[in-house]
Amino acid sequence: MRTQLKLTRDGDAFIARLAPSQASAMYEALSYLRGRDHGDTELILLVGAGREAVDALLERLAGRHTESRDFRLTLEEIHMVHSALTAAPTMFIERGGLFAQEPFHIRLGFYRENFDALAYAVVRAVAEA
């Protein structure tokens, strides 16, 4: 998975050129958290936004992407994505505090280190924009 990410400022938003795997990882993280039986309060705690905002971003990230494309994202949407990438793995902590890699990979289609690297790239890209 490509872990480099470049953001360009566009007024009070950012233009992100996302590789297909990046858009897919962001979608999977958000949709997994959105699909759990969380109310708005829990979802806001996890990703910083309620169902309506998450659904709107999911709609934009959805689809089978075959090539890189640009997404215009607000800082709030970037925060949602970053939070989802870091929060989703915590839902796979088993008794004893161990991370369940196989169920995570089966459900989300990525390894935890992919989510970690992409979350780190998001922070770096915002800092450099």
Positions of PLM-derived features:
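Positively charged, low-complexity terminal tracts
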Residues: 1-129
